[in-house]
């Protein structure tokens, strides 16, 4: 909790640490699939750091292909590694902030309330107001929320 509040409240808490936030847009996820898009984002983040790390720890069972920095997968890494846990918090806080910005542009979707997660309310609002460019087509198709032929 202390780390989470610190990160939410002030970027100064992490000023002496190397980190990079990379957003991968829905069009990339739809084109490449969620796993490949995630791996590409991780590679961009690791290789885009101002400080080159000795080792990249990746939460999961695989590492990005062609990563030019030594990397090690850590299954359930967010529960066992402070570095991975901190990265997970940064990712969550960044995503939530992005949803808050989208909420200002699309208030009818109440993104500040459900943060874009597939809640009953969110699906009801999609039914009512339609699909916007920030939605992943691949996810909505799987859920039956994307018109055929689009």
Residue ranges and their predicted role:
Residues 33, 37-40, 55-80:
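Catalytic beta-strand/loop module used to bind and position nucleotide/cofactor moieties
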Residues 16, 45-54:
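Phosphate/pyrophosphate-binding loops at sites that engage ATP/ADP/AMP, CoA/4′-phosphopantetheine
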């Amino acid at each position: 909790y202390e780390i989470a509040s610190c990160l939410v409240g002030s970027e100064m808490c992490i000023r002496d640490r190397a980190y990079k936030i990379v957003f991968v847009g829905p069009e990339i996820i739809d084109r490449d699939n969620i796993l490949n898009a995630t791996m590409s984002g991780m590679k961009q983040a690791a290789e885009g750091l101002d400080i080159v790390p000795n080792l990249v720890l990746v939460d999961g069972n695989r590492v990005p292909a062609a990563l030019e920095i030594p990397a090690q997968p850590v299954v359930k890494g967010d529960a066992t590694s402070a570095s991975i846990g901190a990265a997970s918090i940064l990712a969550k806080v960044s995503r939530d902030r992005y949803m808050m910005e989208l909420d200002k542009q699309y208030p009818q979707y109440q993104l500040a309330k459900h943060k874009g997660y597939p809640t009953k309310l969110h699906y009801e609002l999609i039914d009512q107001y339609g699909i916007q460019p920030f939605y992943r087509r691949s996810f909505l198709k799987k859920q039956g929320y994307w018109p055929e032929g689009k």
